């Protein structure tokens, strides 16, 4: 494993950035169940701004990580299976990481970004159900793009989590396939 204290510090910093996400999501859920008024519309715009600020902080967090926290593409499945539910491998890239801890923290980061985007999309669609609002249209495009990217990267990490052969640190430490 890399610098354990550095890894814990990065994980702690991610937690501090993400700590308000459940509250933000709860506020959005409550707001979106209310009738529209000038004050609730302003609140929705404020929630969008706040979720975008948290997302920006998450992106900044990712930019501070050392190079060994980045994934490497170990393989690519090009063929689209007939039935995704029974496919042996997910189509697309297969990412590997230095160890499972790092992969888990990176996926926590991705989920946090998805939560931010869900608030943006929820508030924007509540403000403009027809999708024609110059205040929120570009925010929606960005939110959809970021969400798709995060989902794709989480999906690309699944083979790493499911295959001992893709986990270099476990093998280096002499762990067997059961993690012992």
PLM regions: where:
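C-terminal amphipathic "assembly/sorting" segment characterized by alternating charged
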Residues: 171-180
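Central/C-terminal regulatory/activation regions of fungal transcription factors
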Residues: 1-128, 137-164
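A phosphate-binding catalytic loop at a beta-strand-loop-alpha-helix junction
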Residues: 167
